[in-house]
């Protein structure tokens, strides 16, 4: 079962590709969101939160829960609203 954060990060990469920013194979999730944060500086904190949580889920294999999940979901909602404008 794929956690929502993985689906969201895939969506985020699609948005980046639409802007002409493909993700290099050697690029980490945090480097990628950092690149997006340079363009959308108003989303820097939210993007960094998403990158950190995505990395945690991807490499630990555990589901999110509690406060961390709530914070990441709120960040993802703000990012999605902004990028869909």
Region spans (language model):
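Membrane-proximal, non-transmembrane interaction modules
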Residues: 1-85
